Amino acid sequence: MLTAFTRAFKTPDLRRKLLFTLAIVLIFRMGSHVPVPGVSYTAVQNCIKNADSTTGVLGLANLFSGGALLQLSIFALGIMPYITASIIVQLLTVVIPRFEALKKEGQQGQTKMTQYTRYLTIGLAILQSSTLITFAQNPSALFGPSCTSILPNDSIPTLVIMVLTMTAGTGVVMWLGELITDKGIGNGMSLLIFTSIASTFPGSLWAIQQQDGRWDIFIGVILLGFLIIALVVFVEQSQRRIPVQYAKRQVGRQMYGGTSTYIPLKVNMAGVIPVIFASSLLALPSLLAQFNRSTTGDQAGWVTWIEQHLVRGDHPIYMITYIALILFFTFFYVSITFNPTEVADNMKRYGGFIPGIRAGRPTAEYLDYVLTRITVPGAIYLGLISLIPLIALVLVGANQNFPFGGTSILIIVGVGLETVKQIESQLQQRHYEGFLR
């Protein structure tokens, strides 16, 4: 592997891409520590130091921003508005015929869809930054009751400048991600999420060691993390390959077809999206409870019930609800991203068939049958990966947004594998051996 890294940096154009990617990542991480105008940096740091563990409402977003959210930096929103916009646009392709038509138009349609995603990202950034500033006016909702004030001046012009700065920061982050995709290595947006999550690892691990002062627990957590990573790598690489044969056909004097290939159906077809959906949906009751919390101490019954059962991840009701949502969203997302009927029609159009299965409707039914059978273990796997770290780390006083949680590991492994494969293909094009042998 070290030889492969050396060869990658010895190849001029590949070295240029790698250094460009590292430079953009460095700019992104630097921007994550620059506070927006109107925020007291000293007060924010003191509040973070004495903060309660952030769970539910803002924990996931703070994790994806590499801690920039709670620091109220210019990149506080990170890549979350873009992720949300991409998911919404992808879901709308099923509902709106215009979007479905654009999806089938190839590169031109994809460019138009990307443009819509950018517009929606800016709209969501305005909404999310306004919400964050509202929380910042009452910082106890962000950092706990020990924090009372982080905005020396909360006049309307100052708040507007803060919202515009965070929205502009989201636009810059989106541009940086696209620069990496165009001129660097890997998918830019994915790499920015990767670096955001990875940047929280050292601090979170050290916090566990400092909390108990026991090195055996610290080493145990690290070993558990490596074990989970190994399991995720194994499952993410697992796939069911359905053989496809193409019939020979003659065009003029040329003979085409007669080749064989396969349709790869991954065990985890949905990726990390169901976990994000489930985490976001499960955060809504906690958000409602926070806004309806009584200042006199006499809480409504439903607010007390939510705070007892749906805020901390160590409660059985929270865990059961969480895994049920993950199972539902896994089947839902796979059903809208992989259409067996469309795949069968495309195969029939180009003369392809699955050996032993008739073309057309029987092929679609067979693909649907295989997809359902492979999605069941995939959904269970997502649920277990999300719950096992939760159960284990609650025992050492961590919260469900700890970096070794299911969401973090799935993203880090997925992005890492994708980036390594891209570097691998670049090396093999130049007749070098890559990382994967």
Indicate residue ranges for each PLM-predicted region:
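N-terminal cationic and glycine-rich segments that engage phosphates or anionic surfaces
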Residues: M1-K103, Q107-R437
